[in-house]
């Protein structure tokens, strides 16, 4: 994935944008009135070429993939690249401790799903903690924490499966899959 920060000529109105393009998902996340963090999923080969190319070439490709919804974009931070990998923690609870969201798993940065998963973890844990406290039970008890971990497993599995599938769909150039993906994107765009 490629990351950087850009300035736009049109304010972002605190709105996050994500485009699912044939070359990979592209997200612009608001950090200030006219500034967005960029998270751009590309193949390793594409990412290397974009990192080795000029800033002007990088911006031209970024603008072409994103469009002009925020006007013209300019870089305000260095470009960085890092490999995407899916990492799952073996356990999300231990002795009187819980880890949640992206602290438990490293998901592909697609559709804000790591953030959304973290929010759902917090809501579920808060509800369970309130119930445990109202019943005057130990909120750090091993059986309680295990129950929490079990309650979150299905959502974690589903979310991880979804994000992994989206990345595989966009990084696969098998002709039939690429054609189906491009048709789907064209339909979503209209």
Regions of interest found by a model, annotated:
Residues 127-190:
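C-terminal helical "tail/cap" subdomain of flavin- and related membrane-associated enzymes
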Residues 9-11, 43-47, 104-106:
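A short, flexible beta-alpha/helix-coil linker loop
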Residues 3-12, 22, 31:
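Glycine-rich loop(s) and the adjacent beta-strand/alpha-helix scaffold that form part
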Residues 16-20, 88-89:
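Short Gly/Pro-enriched turn/cap motifs at secondary-structure boundaries
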Residues 21-83:
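Conserved FAD/dinucleotide-binding core of flavoprotein oxidoreductases
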Residues 90-110:
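Short FAD-binding loop at a beta-strand-to-alpha-helix junction that anchors the flavin cofactor
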Residues 108-121:
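A conserved FAD-binding loop/helix module that cradles the flavin
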């Amino acid at each position: 994935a490629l990351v950087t920060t850009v300035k736009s000529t049109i304010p972002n109105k605190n709105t996050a944008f994500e485009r699912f393009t044939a070359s990979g998902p592209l997200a612009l996340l608001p950090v200030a009135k006219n500034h967005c963090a960029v998270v751009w999923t590309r193949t390793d080969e594409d990412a290397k070429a974009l990192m080795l190319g000029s800033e002007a070439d990088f911006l031209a490709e970024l603008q072409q993939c994103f469009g002009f919804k925020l006007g013209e974009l300019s870089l305000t931070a260095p470009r960085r690249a890092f490999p995407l990998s899916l990492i799952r923690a073996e356990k999300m609870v231990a002795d009187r401790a819980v880890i949640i969201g992206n602290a438990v798993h490293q998901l592909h940065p697609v559709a804000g799903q790591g953030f959304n998963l973290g929010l759902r973890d917090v809501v579920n844990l808060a509800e369970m903690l309130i119930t445990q406290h109202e019943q005057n039970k130990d909120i750090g008890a091993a059986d309680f924490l295990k129950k929490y971990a079990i309650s979150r497993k299905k959502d974690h599995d589903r979310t991880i499966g979804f994000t992994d599938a989206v990345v595989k769909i966009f990084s696969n150039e098998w002709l039939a899959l690429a054609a189906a993906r491009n048709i789907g994107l064209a339909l979503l765009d209209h």
